[in-house]
Amino acid sequence: VLYRLAEVRLAQGDAAQAEQLARRGLTYASGRPSLQTGLWGLIAQARERQGDPAGAAEARQQALGVR
């Protein structure tokens, strides 16, 4: 549910809220690597839209490290 809400907020242009929702989603995604990867991807997109390329790169690295 939080993943979908984050997607909606990102589509609506509210990148900060999208990132917050995705980060909250990570707290419930333990043991679900595909969900974790998707949430980190959303965080990366949100950070890009907020003008934080370094933070976006960090989120992408986190997505690559999910197992």
Identify the meaning behind each predicted range:
Residues 34-38, 55:
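Structural signature of alpha-solenoid helical repeat junctions
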